[in-house]
């Protein structure tokens, strides 16, 4: 598990525990090497939810979408927000593959349904890898039997590894809280390293929860949590064809008085993995966290934060350990969010660099040392409005260029 702080503003009842996506009661997962990757690494994963599970999804905003994305969205809509499992293959995006892409996704879920004894319409599929490359179906189909056989309540780690592409590390999380006199758990796994940008980009995230909820309530919770996590990260500003978040919930009903706490836990879990993705950005040496305060509203604050953390000039300044506050303010100014420049205050770590829109005297060497941290915190105050927002990214290094010059997307 990547050690990323949850960074919650309010007191949280949620605590980190072990177990990842199979930590919640009743969930099983597996990950195997089916030969989809030339490297021989794990490349196929399965997450199975208990009966009566509800599921909510969030999908890429790109108009160029893999067939599996549309299949997931259509099945969730047709089933009223219910699903039992998701199959994930790594190595081939199965995007821009014509009619074959949809046919292969349907064949894969039907074959898996036969293995599990379930209706194919209750199964989802996600693919990640090289765009334009179809799934090698004979290998995938041959891998279903051992994949199902490997399902277990301890299979979350194997699943977390099997979904990776250019990631340096696997990413998983599990949280636990006492709600209504009983233990509730939330688990998750994710992948993503490059082509990460707000509005869900080249990343996959899968979550589980052992509380029973109405599908519409769960869908609203997932939407809010995604907006404050995966839609608040950027590595390189590129958006993908396959990015998907799927969140399953199944268990004893949870009283509505605890729904806010559950949404808080789901947000914390997603933020944990979102920051892990940003920290694992291709060629990255640090995580950048931008906090915006005093905006007109939360969406405005988030937009400014995302613009700053996505600025190539800001990212390269951080990599060069250069406390160049002008790049930060300039990025905020082009965000499209109205604010009064004469009210701006700016901090890098504990060092205040601006007040009332004017530069302050500061120790550049001390500020530069802050930029050498594993997590670089930038805070900007736009005014006295109620809107606050967070976004995460990473620095931009020459290693990023080398990685993407050598790897076919």
Curated annotation (Swiss-Prot):
Its main location: cytoplasm. Its EC number is 2.3.1.35, 2.3.1.1. Pfam families: ArgJ (PF01960). The record marks 128-129 as: Involved in the stabilization of negative charge on the oxyanion by the formation of the oxyanion hole. GO terms for biological process: L-arginine biosynthetic process; ornithine biosynthetic process. GO terms for molecular function: glutamate N-acetyltransferase activity; L-glutamate N-acetyltransferase activity. Substrate binds at residues 165, 191, 202, 282, 404, 409. It is found in: Cytoplasm. The record marks 201-202 as: Cleavage. Keywords: Acyltransferase, Amino-acid biosynthesis, Arginine biosynthesis, Autocatalytic cleavage, Cytoplasm, Multifunctional enzyme, Transferase. It catalyses: N(2)-acetyl-L-ornithine + L-glutamate = N-acetyl-L-glutamate + L-ornithine; L-glutamate + acetyl-CoA = N-acetyl-L-glutamate + CoA + H(+). GO terms for cellular component: cytoplasm. The active site is at 202 (nucleophile). The keyword Nuclease does not apply. Pathway: Amino-acid biosynthesis; L-arginine biosynthesis; L-ornithine and N-acetyl-L-glutamate from L-glutamate and N(2)-acetyl-L-ornithine (cyclic): step 1/1; Amino-acid biosynthesis; L-arginine biosynthesis; N(2)-acetyl-L-ornithine from L-glutamate: step 1/4. Heterotetramer of two alpha and two beta chains. Belongs to the ArgJ family. Catalyzes two activities which are involved in the cyclic version of arginine biosynthesis: the synthesis of N-acetylglutamate from glutamate and acetyl-CoA as the acetyl donor, and of ornithine by transacetylation between N(2)-acetylornithine and glutamate. HAMAP family: ArgJ (MF_01106). This is Arginine biosynthesis bifunctional protein ArgJ. The lineage of its organism: Bacteria, Bacillati, Cyanobacteriota, Cyanophyceae, Synechococcales. The gene is argJ.
């Amino acid at each position: 598990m990547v050690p990323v702080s949850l960074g919650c503003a309010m007191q949280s009842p949620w605590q980190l525990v072990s177990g990842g996506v199979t930590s919640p009661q009743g969930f099983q997962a597996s990950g195997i090497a089916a030969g989809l990757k030339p490297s021989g690494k794990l490349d196929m994963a399965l997450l199975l939810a208990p009966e009566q599970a509800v599921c909510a999804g969030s999908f890429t905003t790109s108009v160029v979408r893999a067939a599996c994305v549309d299949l997931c969205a259509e099945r969730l809509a047709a089933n009223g927000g219910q699903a039992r499992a998701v199959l994930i293959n790594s190595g081939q995006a199965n995007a821009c593959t014509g009619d074959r892409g949809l046919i292969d996704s349907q064949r894969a879920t039907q074959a898996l349904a036969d293995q599990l004894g379930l209706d194919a319409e209750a199964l989802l599929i996600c693919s990640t890898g090289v765009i334009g490359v179809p799934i090698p179906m004979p290998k995938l189909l041959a891998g279903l039997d051992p994949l199902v056989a490997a399902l277990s309540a301890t299979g979350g780690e194997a699943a977390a590894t099997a979904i990776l592409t250019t990631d340096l590390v696997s990413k998983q999380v599990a949280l636990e809280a006492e709600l209504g006199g009983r233990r509730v758990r939330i688990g998750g796994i994710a992948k993503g390293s490059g082509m990460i940008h707000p509005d869900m980009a080249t990343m996959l995230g899968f979550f589980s929860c052992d509380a029973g909820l109405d599908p519409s309530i769960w869908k609203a919770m997932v939407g809010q949590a995604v907006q404050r996590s995966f839609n608040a990260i950027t590595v390189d500003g590129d958006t993908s064809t396959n990015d998907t978040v799927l969140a399953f919930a199944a268990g004893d009903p949870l009283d509505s008085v605890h729904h806010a706490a559950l949404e808080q836990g789901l947000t914390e879990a997603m933020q944990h993995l979102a920051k892990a993705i940003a920290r694992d950005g291709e060629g990255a040496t640090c995580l950048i966290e931008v906090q915006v305060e005093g905006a007109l509203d939360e969406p405005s604050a988030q937009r400014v934060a995302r613009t700053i953390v996505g600025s190539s000039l800001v990212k390269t300044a951080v990599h060069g350990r250069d406390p160049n506050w002008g790049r930060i303010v300039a990025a905020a100014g082009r965000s499209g969010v109205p604010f009064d420049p004469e009210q701006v205050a700016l901090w890098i770590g504990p060092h205040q660099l601006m007040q009332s829109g004017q530069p302050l005297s500061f120790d550049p060497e001390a500020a530069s040392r802050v930029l050498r941290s594993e997590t670089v915190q930038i805070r900007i105050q736009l005014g006295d409005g109620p809107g606050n927002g967070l976004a995460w990214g990473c620095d931009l290094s020459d290693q990023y260029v080398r990685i993407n010059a050598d790897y076919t997307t």
